Amino acid sequence: MTPVKPALLSANRVHVAFPGLHGAPDARAVDGVDLGIRRGEIVALVGESGCGKTTLARALLGLVAPTGGGVVFDGRPLEYSGRSLKAYRKRVQLVLQDPSGSLNPRHTVYDAVAEGLRIHGHRGDEQAAVAEALSRAGLRPPERFFLRHPHELSGGQRQRVVIAGALVLEPELLVADEPVASLDASVRGEILALLLRLRDELALSALVVTHDLGLAWNIADRVAVMYLGRIVETGPVEQVLTAPRHPYTRALLSVLPEAPGDPVVLTGEPPDPSRVPPGCRFHARCPILAGGEAERAGVAEACRTRDPGILTGDDTVQVACHWAAAR
């Protein structure tokens, strides 16, 4: 039996809460998450807007300190001193969804990619490093792009410049927040193929944050589905997306164009992280509970009153659902 590799980056019972205004309850944006990412692995973190996935990504990057739990990178707890974070962010780089907002319109492509090298005091050949990063990102010949400005590039080319700016520091892990959301459909596949190629060529790890389960299917080794601050289902992407067990995952999948049957329309109010309900946090919107299936399975009371608990961060198929566990 092949031993399981330890996680390169892991969240251990991470909580992130923001103070409420005018005496309101704290907003529990991340409410207890275990999640591991191994070397050379792409993990998709999926959920609708407001579920806490971007806040979790920011906590993993050290941009926001957890209010509970912690982050471990390469076997060591993440420290929040300036020097430690600077060293950490050389090894873990962020790729944002909007390349137009990420790139300074006054800077050339060369300066945009070289910025990280200058921040981290790179001592080698800067021009060679920039050229190699642009080439790896698919902008060839790289010298042709050195003096261009963002407005002279297509959306896909701008996103490749952003990726080159991350690659130039030779990171071990990328955190990509909706990396193709702002791109045309014709370009999305090219950027996803680029991320897969970088994983294969450089043994890069990646956390891809997205609301799109179709994107997760095309790029990820493993998927983690997030709802109201918690991971509610996780496992290898093929197993989770071909046989989803959590009603929320089923609802997300049902709206994909190729999904069989009618889309599942979730009732009730969108999740509010300052008012996490008792029991299963999805129960107020759960079609299984509303349709009587949970009652017939004998778990309706548990759905309303008993927290299913925090899933572990390993690669096994797991679900935080009383009804799924009873089947």
Model region roles, listed by residue range:
Residues 1-242, 325-327:
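ABC transporter nucleotide-binding domains
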